[in-house]
A protein has these predicted regions:
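Short, well-structured N-terminal submotif of metal-dependent ribonuclease cores
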Residues: 1-36, 51-60, 124-125
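Hydrophobic side chains within alpha-helical segments
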Residues: 9, 38, 43, 50, ...
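Phosphate- and divalent-cation-binding pockets in alpha/beta enzyme and binding domains
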Residues: 22, 40, 82, 119-120
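Structural signal for conserved beta-strand scaffold positions within catalytic alpha/beta enzyme cores
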Residues: 33, 75, 131-134
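Acidic, PIN/NYN-like endoribonuclease modules and their adjacent C-terminal/linker elements
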Residues: 2, 100-135
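Active-site-proximal, substrate-binding regions of enzyme catalytic domains
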Residues: 42-71, 82
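Active-site neighborhoods of divalent-metal-dependent phosphate/nucleic-acid chemistry enzymes
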Residues: 70-116
Length: 135
């Protein structure tokens, strides 16, 4: 069975953060993500550069690692309408709901380190579809 991961999980593969070990353990699973995951991860690394936490060269090297990560990047287009519907239902941004729409399509779940996303999706009809990393 595939598992959907979001950028917050993938970033832990290249940054030393809490739950890094749990994120690394997921690399043994069959992982999928909407193609936007890589842009989101690169944007987060850019923010780390802007804050002076890593260099631009380090960010580029880490994005290269993510490009080669064991994640099947899937097209967003087939899931955008469902993501918009989910976003309006749970009151959470569409870009996160694309991960949820992909998980629903593949009858699986999303693993995230985004507590707000997990809390927004904690509704009876979505039970267990968005899980916090390490829980």
């Amino acid at each position: 069975m595939s598992i959907v991961i979001d950028a917050s999980v993938a970033l832990k593969w290249v940054l030393d953060e809490p739950e890094t070990e749990a994120a690394l353990a997921l690399r043994n699973e069959q992982l999928i993500a909407p193609e936007l995951w890589l842009a989101e991860a690169a944007n987060a690394l850019w923010r780390h550069v802007k804050l002076g936490e890593i260099t631009a060269e380090q960010a580029l090297a880490r994005v290269s690692e993510l490009v080669n990560a064991p994640v099947a990047s899937l097209p967003i287009e087939p899931h955008v309408l469902r993501a918009l519907n989910l976003a309006t239902e749970i009151g959470h941004p569409v870009y996160d709901c694309v991960y949820l729409a992909l998980a629903l399509y593949h009858d699986t779940h999303v693993i995230t380190d985004d507590r707000r996303f997990a809390a927004a999706a904690a509704q009876p009809e979505l039970a267990g579809r968005v899980r916090l990393l390490g829980s």
